[in-house]
Amino acid sequence: MNRLSCFLLVIGLCIGLSNANLIWNEKNTVFFKSSLGRNNVLKIHCTSEDNLGFHFLRPGETYDFSFHDSIVRSDFYCELWQGPNFKFHASFMAYQGGGLIVHYGKKNFWDAREDGIYFTHGKETPKLEYKWK
């Protein structure tokens, strides 16, 4: 197998294993949903090279942001709070990309529930990733 064939095979496998689309200009999106109990507000703060500010979600509400991967790195670090006086907290990398492999149309879904933060790319059932501290 020549080098070009090997390269194309590796690229094809990377695309096939990714949840990204083949639309080359489609932005990546990070979604947040509050599935918390009644009267429990979710506070979200995400940063990368930019500060995306604070967002407050009531149960059932959503917040999302979209972006193109950077050739250098595309990292979005997020902090979430909930409960009385926002005493329960979780912090995590909500999106990591860019660099060697640039994603197009990748989707990360985060769902805040009473027992923690659940994650899915949208194709599978959400799984508990982080517990509240």
Curated annotation (Swiss-Prot):
Family per record: Belongs to the plant self-incompatibility (S1) protein family.
Cellular localisation: Secreted
Protein name: S-protein homolog 9
GO cellular component, one term: extracellular region
Gene of this entry: SPH9
Predominant subcellular localization, coarse grouping: secreted
Keywords carried by this UniProt record: Secreted, Self-incompatibility, Signal
Signal peptide (UniProt feature, chain positions): 1-20
Pfam family, one: Self-incomp_S1
Natural source organism: Arabidopsis thaliana (Mouse-ear cress)
Record GO biological process: rejection of self pollen
InterPro entries listed in its UniProt record: Self-incomp_S1
